[in-house]
Structure formats: C-alpha cells, structure tokens
Amino acid sequence: MSVVIRLARAGTKKRPVYHVVVADSRFPRDGRFIERLGHFNPLLPKDNEARLKLDLDKVKAWVAKGAQPSDRVARFLDAAGVMKREARNNPEKAVPRKERKAAAEAAAKK
C-alpha cells in the first residue's frame, strides 16, 4: 500500500478549499482517505495565517511511517521546516543562443 500526503479538493464551484489528507495512492483524489492533517485555502492572501493549517506532529509521524508528500504538499512542508524539498532540474531552454542574441542586437541597432 503506497501512502501519500496530498490535497483533496473541497468547497464550491470557483471557490476551492483543499484538505491535506493521507490516502492510499489508488484512492480517488477527493474520495476515501486515512486521516485529515489540515486544510489550505488558496483564496486567502499569502500572509494570512489561516491560509494553511497543518497538524505538524501528525505530518511528521506519517512521513516517518513512509508516506510520500505530493509536490505541492512537499512545498508546504519545506516552508514549514518539516522536510527539505529537492531542487528541481530547470534547464535553461528559453535562453537565446549566442547567434540569436547577436542577431537580435544587430536588429535593434538598425
């Protein structure tokens, strides 16, 4: 049984609220879960304390048991200082090459 800590959507249409839950990875996103660990309201300002509420003791216990957090939850846990999130590989594909950069500069001078 692969256990994950993830967000389950709640709320109404166009007014989402998410519950931070521990669930089997095979369960539906908004379906059955093992335990609710907190909630997240993305509509509140980022500096508002009520935007994210987590029971950090329960989160630490589930991580110790082997539960894998989703990407978004891992970001929350990194901000809370519970666990360290790995740096992602972001290649610089959008950076123009030297030839294109030189051509763009030449076109700008005309």
Curated annotation (Swiss-Prot):
Keywords: Ribonucleoprotein, Ribosomal protein. GO terms for molecular function: structural constituent of ribosome. PANTHER family: 30S RIBOSOMAL PROTEIN S16, SMALL RIBOSOMAL SUBUNIT PROTEIN BS16M. Coiled coil: none annotated. One of its GO terms (biological process) is translation. Pfam families: Ribosomal_S16. GO terms for cellular component: cytoplasm; small ribosomal subunit. Belongs to the bacterial ribosomal protein bS16 family. HAMAP family: Ribosomal_bS16. This is Small ribosomal subunit protein bS16. InterPro entries: Ribosomal_bS16 (IPR000307), Ribosomal_bS16_dom_sf (IPR023803). The keyword GTP-binding does not apply. Residues 87-110 are annotated as: Disordered.
